[in-house]
From Swiss-Prot:
<feature type="region of interest" description="RED subdomain">
    <location>
        <begin position="105"/>
        <end position="153"/>
    </location>
</feature>
<dbReference type="InterPro" id="IPR043182">
    <property type="entry name" value="PAIRED_DNA-bd_dom"/>
</dbReference>
<keyword id="KW-0562">Pair-rule protein</keyword>
<dbReference type="GO" id="GO:0000981">
    <property type="term" value="F:DNA-binding transcription factor activity, RNA polymerase II-specific"/>
</dbReference>
<feature type="DNA-binding region" description="Paired">
    <location>
        <begin position="27"/>
        <end position="153"/>
    </location>
</feature>
<keyword id="KW-0238">DNA-binding</keyword>
<dbReference type="GO" id="GO:0005634">
    <property type="term" value="C:nucleus"/>
</dbReference>
<feature type="compositionally biased region" description="Low complexity">
    <location>
        <begin position="433"/>
        <end position="461"/>
    </location>
</feature>
<dbReference type="InterPro" id="IPR043565">
    <property type="entry name" value="PAX_fam"/>
</dbReference>
<keyword id="KW-0804">Transcription</keyword>
<dbReference type="GO" id="GO:0045944">
    <property type="term" value="P:positive regulation of transcription by RNA polymerase II"/>
</dbReference>
<keyword id="KW-0677">Repeat</keyword>
<dbReference type="GO" id="GO:0000977">
    <property type="term" value="F:RNA polymerase II transcription regulatory region sequence-specific DNA binding"/>
</dbReference>
<keyword id="KW-0805">Transcription regulation</keyword>
<dbReference type="InterPro" id="IPR036388">
    <property type="entry name" value="WH-like_DNA-bd_sf"/>
</dbReference>
<dbReference type="InterPro" id="IPR001523">
    <property type="entry name" value="Paired_dom"/>
</dbReference>
<dbReference type="InterPro" id="IPR017970">
    <property type="entry name" value="Homeobox_CS"/>
</dbReference>
């Protein structure tokens, strides 16, 4: 027989002894996974039940019985367990049948007692069974059960005598409890035995099964385990040839090898489940903010090429990033980098590499100054550059630190759990965020312009210029906010401490007037580009020091400009037009310039979402 024919024969319906096909023709028959036919709700025929018990008595394993008879393994186990308990193969009622106390051994002993002394009463038989140790009082059959058994044993003798004398057979009800009665008195008028007689005759075959069919556990040696593990590494489901080869090498049977592979696969699945379930995704979100804030004044990595990585978290998962996006570091607003303190370099760590400032709803440069320290050529920062940047960012922090202002364009959300509506659509880390990351040559050229001046004089000039700029920015930002707040927020003036559940849609923002759009353009540019001198600031006096970004023309730049898209129009690029272009999420009603202003030839393509989103 070919393999195809064997497979077809395996899937051919196998009729498990049902006498008629009327139930099958009525559509009640089903085919199980083994190809055997069963009728749902109908017990398995007695001949199949008897065959299961006989095969089990011959020492055949239940799994082999299941495959040969095409009966499910659960059905085989249930029939065998019930036969062990009751001594009967008859199907019980739903919920299981009552265990029969009178086992075949007890029945044989009762028959001996009755044959030796026919006048013995049932209660005397019970007491004798207990006295001789055949059973104890908890397992001894009841008096009524012994009486029924004695009457059933006496019935064949009466039927034999009545049939021998020519008298008609009995009613057949009493004689149905023994196999011998079926031959003499179980026939009806048509000469065909009834189904009840056959079922009752075969329900108690009297086959002695071993009470404990469990074998001793197999103990594997080290060499056997080594062979099995090597084979398991090659394949988890060995074929017949692999099992035969392993059986020769390990001196084990194929059945033992098959069981070992099954147990090994189960153990592997359990290990995978424990590993995947033991590390929940939210466990990394419980990073302490105290540890992150304690290392805040330290400097970013000493490698200049690693400086852009300070803008994005290196080893944080999205849950931690979302947690930090809602932590605005309000308790660390007073922490600033001291100009006289030596700047100690440290490794890039999650405590320092926080999310970019334009990913925070409230950007306070004075609270996160460490991410903007300008490294020198040897990794250390020059004191002059630190003084200027620290002073300049401290002044800008007073302008852009909206937690201390009375007019808040974006109210703070106190809940760190609403990470979907706010974290979705945050700006990716673009070259705009690398506003102060420059090489050592830029700092050298900046400090070279002030080589003849004293550092204290430079600090005074920087402070004076920054104060003038901050005063002008405060006045202008207050006017812009007052002009746009009524259009954008309307009735939300009384709810400034709360944040709306969803960001404003682009349609709501597009309904504003052209002047409001102009104001939104300016406000957005102030939020996301705090270090650029925009044209509206041209009327104010410039600071008294040479800034490293704007103190020299663009052509002889010794370092890569942090804003390549503005390189063609530096330092005065055209102001944003009144028709603002909005993205699908307008990022808390912040307008962006039209993409036609962007020089795509010099700006590398940036993904909309960062890699760690």
């Amino acid at each position: 027989m070919t393999v195809t024919a064997f497979a077809a024969a395996m899937h051919r319906p196998f009729f498990n002894g049902y006498s008629t096909m009327q139930d099958m023709n009525s559509g009640q028959g089903r085919v199980n996974q083994l190809g055997g036919v069963f009728i749902n709700g109908r017990p398995l025929p007695n001949n199949i039940r008897l065959k299961i018990v006989e095969m089990a008595a011959d020492g055949i394993r239940p799994c082999v019985i299941s495959r040969q008879l095409r009966v499910s393994h659960g059905c085989v186990s249930k029939i065998l367990n019930r036969y062990q308990e009751t001594g009967s193969i008859r199907p019980g009622v739903i919920g299981g049948s009552k265990p029969r106390i009178a086992t075949p051994e007890i029945e044989n002993r009762i028959e001996e007692y009755k044959r030796s002394s026919p006048g013995m009463f049932s209660w005397e038989i019970r007491e004798k069974l207990i006295r001789e140790g055949v059973c104890d009082r908890s397992t001894a059959p009841s008096v009524s059960a012994i009486s029924r058994l004695v009457r059933g044993r006496d019935a064949p003798l009466d039927n034999d005598m009545s049939s021998a004398s020519g008298s008609p057979a009995g009613d057949g009800t009493k004689a149905s409890s023994s196999c011998g009665s079926d031959v003499s008195g179980g026939h009806h008028n048509n000469g065909k035995p009834s189904d009840e007689d056959i079922s009752d005759c075969e329900s108690e075959p009297g086959i002695a099964l071993k009470r404990k069919q469990r074998r001793c556990r197999t103990t594997f040696s080290a060499s056997q385990l080594d062979e099995l593990e090597r084979a398991f590494e090659r394949t988890q489901y060995p074929d017949i040839y692999t099992r035969e080869e392993l059986a020769q090498r390990t001196n084990l049977t194929e059945a033992r090898i098959q069981v070992w592979f099954s147990n090994r696969r189960a153990r592997l699945r359990k290990q995978h489940t424990s590993v995947s379930g033991g590390a929940p995704g939210g466990a990394a979100a419980s990073v302490s903010h105290v540890a992150a804030s304690s290392s805040l004044p330290s400097v970013v990595s000493s490698v200049p090429s690693m400086a852009p990585l300070a803008m994005m978290p290196g080893s944080l998962d999205p849950a931690t990033v979302y947690q930090q996006q809602y932590d605005f570091y309000g308790s660390h607003a007073n922490i600033s980098v001291s100009a006289a303190a030596p700047m100690a370099s440290s490794n890039l760590s999650p405590g320092i590499t926080t999310t970019p400032p334009h990913h925070h709803q409230f950007y306070n440069p004075s609270a996160n100054t460490a991410s903007y320290i300008m490294p020198g050529e040897n990794g250390n920062t020059t004191p002059t550059g630190n003084i200027i940047v620290s002073s300049y960012e401290t002044q800008l922090g007073s302008v852009y630190g909206t937690e201390t202002e009375t007019h808040q364009t974006m109210p703070r959300n106190e809940s760190p759990n609403e990470s979907v509506s706010s974290a979705f659509g945050q700006l990716p880390p673009t070259p705009n965020s690398l506003s102060a990351v420059v090489s050592g040559a830029g700092v050298t050229s900046s400090s070279g312009a002030n080589s003849g001046a004293d550092p204290s004089q430079s600090l005074a000039n920087a402070s004076a210029g920054s104060e003038e700029l901050s005063a002008a920015l405060k006045v202008e930002s207050v006017d812009l906010i007052a002009a746009s707040q009524s259009q954008l927020y309307g009735g939300w003036s009384s709810m400034q401490a709360l944040r709306p559940n969803a960001p404003l849609s682009p349609e709501d923002s597009l309904n504003s007037t052209s002047s409001t759009s102009q104001a939104l353009d300016v406000t957005a540019h102030q939020m996301f580009h705090p270090y650029q001198h925009t044209p509206q600031y041209a009327s104010y006096p410039a600071p008294g020091h040479a800034h490293s970004h704007h103190g020299h023309p663009h052509a002889p730049h010794p370092h890569a400009h942090p804003h390549p898209q503005y390189a063609g129009a530096h330092p005065h690029y055209p102001p944003p037009s009144s028709s603002a272009h909005f993205m699908p999420q307008n990022f808390n009603a912040a307008a962006f310039p039209s993409p036609s202003k962007v020089n795509y030839t010099t700006m590398p393509p940036q993904p909309f979402y960062p890699s760690w989103y």
